[in-house]
């Protein structure tokens, strides 16, 4: 009986967090253009490198002025110094990990990538997805990707308490919740030989205090934020 009540309490808490976070993030905001960073980088005579990115608005990048400013485009530009990079993005704004499994995984496999970048977790955190469900679906996704010859890199989940649109106590709740989801990224990656971007190693105080890293909607990052994300990704690559 006690266990059942505790389970209900945890579920209700997740729903409440999801509802409050969704309201904070989805209430009327400036509508920002989104982008598809797919394209080619570098000279055609160089050895080819096929890069696939699955994800959410961290890839479609509302808040930047052009595709060149998106973190994955910046990474591909650096890779193109020695490779002919073919980037294909399957990312859709608002996606949760279940959406990646159900809608983005199949076309990714058909692309036969050499490198796969998986940027997911923020929407699961915000919308009250349970940690157990997130882990199950992320493992389902990574298990399939790891069964290919591709190098798989997960985004992890940064400190979402830094988002300017969030205020205490929701800010603190999102910070703790996002840390748990980040740990899931690391656990799943370790099981399948994947890697995780260390966004949390990037100075958190700067993300809390520098509004220049955020776009006008105070939720998505700006071009300056994408530049920092690209630096984090490049250190892993």
Outline where the language-model segments fall.
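N-terminal secretory targeting modules
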Residues: 1-52, 81
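Alpha/beta-hydrolase-fold catalytic nucleophile elbow
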Residues: 119, 155-156
